[in-house]
Structure formats: structure tokens, C-alpha cells
């Protein structure tokens, strides 16, 4: 067993095994149980504004987004899809509602996949054969995206509201129509704005099929509320092995959706960890401004691309112990900070120099990690900043 700069290298705890699914490709991104769980987002730009859309896709790509979806409500948007799909760094999925003609336009434009909403596309059941044939010829998958807010009227009438059973039956009915036409490159989503209903729907769906599942809490709300809803729902499902691709829906810039999605996966050890800040809520024992210190250290280390464990501690109760368990840390008190590297105190600095010193040491250790073989050289598999 090797030892990194801090804690001994040990395997990350595992959750339930991934639910076995069929596999499919969204351009060069695999989706299904044989592939890592991918993070998606959706552009907020007008799709026909090609430059703005590609700029936002570039920002999403830089943030770690794996797949991006774009809206296609008008012909001018459909006309822009080919250029967007051609120049996007990541696979582009066209999001189609109401007009079936845009499904075929998206396929012809070279989109990596198409999301269809069977609840609001005109006479969709009768067009499934054509859609299946076109998608098969292009070699792209279809996502059947059922939403509580636009549930097929037949299932709304049967169940009275968007119950888990209604969402699942609607999705599987449409999937069966595609299967009748020999098309099986399908992934499914059954989204609801209530995490409890959403979780129940995906649990039922997972028991009844082997399609890859795209997780999402629809209309989750503003950043704080939406983050909580998504984390609760995704955690409940992913911890049981359910889910193959995720999208955190927030009333916030799309990059924030990606950040939250990645953090959820990292927190469940479903993705190699990156910079993580663990901070105490502070209390009367704190001898430094924990909030400011944590924010400044986080900002200073933002973008650091190595798995570095950093502890920033605000009092003497847990401070020394936590700092010793990290690759780099500080235990603060009495206007000073003891700087730990690899569990050993290397210096004591005035409180005013803590942030600067930590950032300098972090950069030095990062360079050392890279020279030793990159992220694998670290113990935790993740940059972690612990603040208490």
C-alpha cells in the first residue's frame, strides 16, 4: 500500500452496485452501467444565437459538463442546430416539445441525441415509427422525457394526477412503441418537482426495465432550494445504484448546475474528488473568522487540478487533529496559525498570513504531486479543504 502526502491511500467506501442497464453512446460519451455517471446541463441562451450558445457551451465544458441540451422551439432554432452540434466540444442533445418536425431537423443536423416529450408532442404515438427509423439511420439514441407538468392526458385521466405510477407507465408505454419498431437505444427520465414522488417513480422504473435512466428533479427552484432538492433525490437513488446521467435543474446560471452535479457525485464517491471544503458552522470557541478564512482559501485554490486535502481549522478542539490528517492544514488560535504539511508543523504564522501561506504551500504540494504522477500520488483521490 502506498502513502500519499497525507492520509494512507485506502479504497473509497462503495455504495450499492450500479443497476445493470443496456449501454448507449451519446456521441463519445457512454451512458449506462458500464460507464461513469455523466453530468448534463441545458443552455439558457436562445439557440438561434449560435455564438452565445457556443460560448455558454464552452463555459459548461470548462466547468466539467459532459453533455449539453439545447431548446428548439422555433424553426430558426432548428436551423442553428447543425452549426452548434458541429462546433460544440461536448455532445449536444436537442430538446423537442410540441412540434415533431423538429425531431427530424435535429437528427438531420447531427445532434448527438434527441429528447422527446411524449406528453406534448402532437400525435406523437403515430410518429414513433418515423422517429425510430430516422434515429436508427443516424445512429443516435432517444431520451423519452416524461415530466409531471406535461404528463400525457391519458395517464393524467387514469391516475388523476402525476403519480409515480403515471409517470412510469407513460414512459414505458412510449418505450414499447419504439421497441415495436426495432429501436432500443433509449434512455428514460420521469421527472417531478417533488423529490419524494420523483424518487418513488425512478425506483419503480428501475425495477421494470433496463434502460439507462437520466435523473432530474424538474423545476427544482432557485439555487439553494434546487440544490437541496436535487441532492436529496439524487443521493437517495444513486446510493442504491440507480441513475446513469444527471441534470441538476436550478433557476441559476447553468454552470452552477454542473458544479452542484459534480459535487453530488464526488460526495458519493461516484467521481474522483476535486477541491472540497468542509467547514464547521463556527461557535464561541472559534478564534478566527472561520467564514472569511474558508472563503478566501477556497477562492485562492479555485481551479487547482490536483486531489489535495487541505484543512483550515478555527479552534483548538478539533483543529490540530484535523490538520494532521490532511496533506496541508492550519490550526488557528491566539492570533496565529500552525501550518501542517504531511502531519508535521512546518511553521507558525500570524493570522494575517494564514491564507497567503496556505495557498503558497498548496501550489508547492500540487507541483510535487504532478511530478510524482498526478492525482494518483495523493491519498484521498481529491482536493479537500476542511474548515472548522
Curated annotation (Swiss-Prot):
Key words of the record:
4Fe-4S, Iron, Iron-sulfur, Isoprene biosynthesis, Metal-binding, Oxidoreductase
Keyword flag Oxidoreductase = yes
Q: Name one GO biological process term.
A: terpenoid biosynthetic process
Catalytic activities: (2E)-4-hydroxy-3-methylbut-2-enyl diphosphate + oxidized [flavodoxin] + H2O + 2 H(+) = 2-C-methyl-D-erythritol 2,4-cyclic diphosphate + reduced [flavodoxin]
UniProt keyword annotation of Metal-binding present: yes
Pathway(s) where this gene product acts: Isoprenoid biosynthesis; isopentenyl diphosphate biosynthesis via DXP pathway; isopentenyl diphosphate from 1-deoxy-D-xylulose 5-phosphate: step 5/6
Q: What is its EC number?
A: 1.17.7.3
Bias (Polar residues): 377-388
State a single Pfam family of this protein: GcpE
Query: Which coenzyme or cofactor does it need?
Result: [4Fe-4S] cluster
Q: Where is this region: Disordered?
A: 369-388
What is the documented function of this protein?
A: Converts 2C-methyl-D-erythritol 2,4-cyclodiphosphate (ME-2,4cPP) into 1-hydroxy-2-methyl-2-(E)-butenyl 4-diphosphate.
Q: Which HAMAP family match?
A: IspG
Name this polypeptide is given = 4-hydroxy-3-methylbut-2-en-1-yl diphosphate synthase (flavodoxin)
**Record organism:** Mycolicibacterium paratuberculosis (strain ATCC BAA-968 / K-10)
Coding gene?
ispG
Amino acid at each position: 500500500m502506498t502513502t500519499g502526502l497525507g492520509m494512507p491511500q485506502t479504497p473509497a467506501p462503495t455504495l450499492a452496485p450500479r443497476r445493470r442497464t443496456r449501454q448507449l453512446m451519446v456521441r463519445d460519451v457512454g451512458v449506462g452501467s458500464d460507464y461513469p455517471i455523466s453530468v448534463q446541463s441545458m443552455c439558457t441562451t436562445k439557440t438561434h444565437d449560435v455564438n452565445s450558445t457556443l460560448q455558454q457551451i464552452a463555459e459548461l465544458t470548462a466547468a466539467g459538463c459532459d453533455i449539453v441540451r439545447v431548446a428548439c422551439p422555433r424553426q430558426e432554432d432548428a436551423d442553428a442546430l447543425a452549426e452548434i452540434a458541429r462546433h460544440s466540444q461536448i455532445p449536444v442533445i436537442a430538446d423537442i416539445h410540441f412540434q415533431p418536425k423538429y425531431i427530424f431537423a435535429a437528427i438531420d443536423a447531427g445532434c448527438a441525441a434527441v429528447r422527446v416529450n411524449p406528453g406534448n408532442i402532437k400525435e406523437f404515438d403515430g410518429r414513433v415509427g418515423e422517429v425510430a427509423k430516422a434515429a436508427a439511420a443516424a445512429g443516435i439514441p432517444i431520451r423519452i422525457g416524461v415530466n409531471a407538468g406535461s404528463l400525457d392526458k391519458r395517464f393524467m385521466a387514469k391516475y388523476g394526477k402525476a403519480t409515480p405510477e403515471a409517470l412510469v407507465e407513460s414512459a414505458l408505454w412510449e418505450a414499447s412503441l419504439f421497441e415495436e419498431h426495432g429501436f432500443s437505444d433509449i434512455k428514460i427520465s420521469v421527472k417531478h418537482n417533488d423529490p419524494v414522488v420523483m424518487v418513488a417513480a425512478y425506483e419503480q422504473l428501475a425495477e421494470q426495465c433496463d434502460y439507462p435512466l437520466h435523473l432530474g428533479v424538474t423545476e427544482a427552484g432557485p439555487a439553494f432550494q434546487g440544490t437541496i432538492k436535487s441532492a436529496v433525490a439524487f443521493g437517495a437513488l444513486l446510493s442504491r445504484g440507480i441513475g446513469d446521467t444527471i441534470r441538476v435543474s436550478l433557476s441559476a446560471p447553468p454552470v452552477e448546475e454542473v458544479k452542484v452535479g459534480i459535487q453530488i457525485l464526488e460526495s458519493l464517491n461516484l467521481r474522483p474528488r476535486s477541491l472540497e471544503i468542509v467547514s464547521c458552522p463556527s461557535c464561541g470557541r472559534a478564534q478566527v473568522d472561520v467564514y472569511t478564512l474558508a472563503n478566501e482559501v477556497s477562492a485562492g485554490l479555485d481551479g487547482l487540478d490536483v486531489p489535495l486535502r487541505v484543512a483550515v481549522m478555527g479552534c483548538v478542539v478539533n483543529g490540530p487533529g484535523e490538520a494532521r490528517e490532511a496533506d496541508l492544514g492550519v490550526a488557528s488560535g491566539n492570533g496565529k496559525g500552525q501550518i501542517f504539511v504531511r502531519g508535521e508543523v512546518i511553521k507558525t504564522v500570524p493570522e494575517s498570513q494564514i491564507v497567503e501561506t496556505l495557498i503558497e504551500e498548496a501550489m508547492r504540494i500540487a507541483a510535487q504531486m504532478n511530478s510524482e504522477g498526478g492525482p494518483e500520488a495523493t491519498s484521498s483521490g481529491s482536493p479537500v479543504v476542511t474548515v472548522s
